């Protein structure tokens, strides 16, 4: 199976080793986000504006891309690049920005546990757009693998971790902050459906752009993150009065920004040289990293639901990428 069909590059050689390392780093950085964010809490809350962290992350990615072009880590095109090729990335930035804001607004219409479980529907929406927009076909075996990924995510979100002081398992989001009553509203379900659709569309659309344009990945990322910085700068400025850009930041917060920036760059490489489906497996496998770090850093206990989720993920990987 080829890379563009959602598979892995050819086995053997240094290229395969680099690809494997990139996937492992992507999984680690994605899974570390929630535990690192929990370590930033002061008196049970994040002491800085979320928009500040997003803006600084986008700015860090932009600077790293510019640096890679300036020092020659990636070659600049032989002729002046057609800057009109930057315009399509504005839509990618807009879709990602809309998704980030929907996540915040969804918390007003449902509890974090319900959101964590239902948000796994974005796996299905990504697969749908992958087939429709890229004209790829998934076999029954591959479709079953993606269903197992959805089940694994829902299983882990429903109770993969437990606070030692609580008799009941909790979702990763509530295990560190305390229990929240389960609730969901009709507007919340509609917003969640919109979130899942935008999530799938943004991933597949960005993959299409990255693969269609014959430009260095760093230059494509430069286009994307320029729009991302402008969009998030506007959102931050329009967010009303609040803490300053760096107010409340600590060493842990800086690590969150750096890890998220690295993750964004790695994910773009995954989608250019792999696929949106590969990205789904990276995100799902990151649950294992999330759980292990939560247990080690936050003193949370792993439950049977976590081990079931890990088993389902392993089975899904075998079904999708294993020998036919």
Swiss-Prot record:
- Keyword Hydrolase listed? The answer is no
| Cytoplasmic-side segments | 1-18, 74-85, 162-177, 236-248, 301-324
Where it mainly occurs, coarsely classed, is Golgi
User: Which BP terms from GO are recorded?
Assistant: transmembrane transport
Q: Where in the cell is it found?
A: Golgi apparatus membrane
The residue range of the signal peptide is: none
A molecular function (GO) held by this record is: pyrimidine nucleotide-sugar transmembrane transporter activity
Q: Where are the transmembrane segments?
A: 19-39, 53-73, 86-106, 141-161, 178-198, 215-235, 249-271, 280-300
Domain of life where this protein originates: Eukaryota
Show which residues sit on the Lumenal side of the membrane.
40-52, 107-140, 199-214, 272-279
Q: What GO CC annotations are associated with the protein?
A: Golgi apparatus; Golgi membrane
**Subunit composition?**
Found in a complex with SLC35A2 and SLC35A3.
Family label? Belongs to the nucleotide-sugar transporter family. SLC35A subfamily.
Q: What is the protein's known function?
A: Mediates the transport of CDP-ribitol. Does not exhibit CMP-sialic acid, UDP-galactose and UDP-N-acetylglucosamine transport activity.
Q: What is this protein called?
A: Probable UDP-sugar transporter protein SLC35A4
Record the organism: Sus scrofa (Pig)
């Amino acid at each position: 199976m080829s890379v563009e069909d959602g598979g892995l590059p050819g086995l053997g050689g240094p290229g395969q080793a680099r690809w494997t390392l990139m996937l492992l780093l992507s999984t680690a950085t994605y899974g570390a986000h929630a535990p690192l964010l929990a370590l930033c809490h002061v008196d049970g809350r994040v002491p800085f504006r979320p928009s500040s962290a997003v803006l600084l992350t986008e700015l860090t990615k932009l600077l790293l891309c510019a640096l890679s072009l300036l020092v020659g880590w990636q070659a600049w095109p032989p002729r002046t690049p057609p800057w009109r090729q930057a315009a399509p990335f504005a839509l990618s930035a807009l879709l990602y920005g809309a998704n980030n804001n929907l996540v915040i607004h969804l918390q007003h219409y449902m509890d974090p546990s319900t959101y964590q479980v239902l948000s796994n529907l974005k796996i299905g929406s990504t697969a749908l757009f992958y087939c429709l927009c890229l004209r790829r076909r998934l076999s029954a075996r591959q479709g079953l693998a993606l269903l197992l990924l959805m089940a694994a995510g829902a299983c882990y979100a429903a109770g993969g971790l437990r606070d030692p002081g609580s008799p009941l398992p909790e979702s990763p989001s509530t295990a560190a902050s305390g229990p929240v009553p389960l609730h969901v509203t009709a507007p919340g379900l509609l917003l969640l459906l919109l979130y899942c659709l935008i999530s799938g569309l943004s991933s597949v659309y960005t993959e299409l752009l990255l693969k269609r344009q014959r430009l260095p990945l760093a230059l494509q990322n430069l286009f994307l993150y320029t729009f991302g910085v402008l969009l998030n700068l506007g959102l931050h400025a329009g967010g009303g009065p609040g803490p300053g850009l760096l107010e409340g930041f600590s060493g842990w917060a800086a690590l969150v920004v750096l890890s998220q920036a690295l993750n964004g760059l790695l994910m773009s490489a995954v989608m250019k040289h792999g696929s949106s489906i590969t990205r789904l497996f990276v995100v799902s496998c990151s649950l294992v990293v999330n759980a292990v770090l939560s247990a080690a850093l936050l003193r949370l206990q792993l439950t049977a639901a976590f081990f079931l989720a890990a088993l389902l993920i392993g089975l899904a990987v075998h079904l999708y990428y294993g020998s036919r």
